[in-house]
Amino acid sequence: MRSLKKPHQADHTAAGASAAVALSTYPTYKPENCPFETVIVDVTHRCNMGCHNCYVPNRSIPDLEAKWLAEIFAKLPPGTFVRLVGGEPTLREDLPELIRAIRDARHHPVVLTNGLKMADRPYVRELRRAGLQIVYLSLNGAFDDELYLAIDAMRCAERKTQAFDNLRAEHIFTSLGMIVVRDINEHAVKPLWKAAQTARNVREVHLRSVGAIGRYQARPSLTLDELQEVFTTATGIQPDTLAQRERTNSSYDFMQGRLRVQLTQWPDLGSETRGRLTPEGRIAPFFEHVIANEGGY
């Protein structure tokens, strides 16, 4: 039995304490003054999976109201990437309406999903017709059922593969995401990368480490350098050939051919690109807000 850390309301580690202090030193913003290119919106905390790694495992938090969300979307600076997350955002029956509200406000709608509902192609088509432009598809086990069981507590490779195929068939831009867990799925980066290369709708591959937030597998998390080594070993790409875009202490962003690759040692504190909509209608730095409100919202 793999050791899991139970959800809790507050992080009393030095890292958690420093993050809470960091949040207090960051301003929050009115939506119309949002400086972040991406705003992450927790549209529901319900989920249809019980993954071993989940930064917000609290399922009792009520959904944000669609009308209120539309009002927030209308205030954001035009061209914002509005990323709808959960829980699992596809559990909202009004997800197409939320996507339309984002498009009507002249933004880019993005859905971050585990992909289970997107195994249904008519549903994917409905979201595309509503205006969905980009999907971030979680593939922690690539296409291997046993890896999904080990990381996400469910054998779901067939549905994940079908979701991947449906997004390609519906020509929806897709980012493939994987949480890389030490000694479990490092080798799965190779088939993930191969799939990204063969599907023209895939624009990005994002590998991240396990974050010690919420519920997580209690084993040493991969460092940023280790993530890079996992990637280069799996792909056969030499580190000195990577076309670097940006590197910080916790993230590495580069281009490899037509694909953008992001490596993130989670959490990426101090990120200047991602904000989070708070229940009060303000925009806060994403990672700082998640940690300072661990176990809640």
Language-model segments: what does each one mean?
Residues S60-E71, P89-I134, L139-E146, D152-R159, ...:
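Canonical radical SAM enzyme core domain
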Residues V43-C47, L139-G141, S209:
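Short, small-residue-rich loop/turn micro-motifs
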Residues P78-G79, A105, A130, E170, ...:
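Structured helix-beta-strand junction loops
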Residues T13-P122, R129:
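Conserved alpha-helical substructure of the radical SAM core
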Residues V39-V41, V82-L84, P109-V111, V135-L137, ...:
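Hydrophobic faces of well-ordered beta-strands that scaffold small-molecule active sites
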Residues M1-N33, L259-Y297:
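Radical SAM enzyme core and accessory elements
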Residues L149, M154-V290:
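Radical SAM enzyme [4Fe-4S]-AdoMet core and its adjacent flexible, acidic
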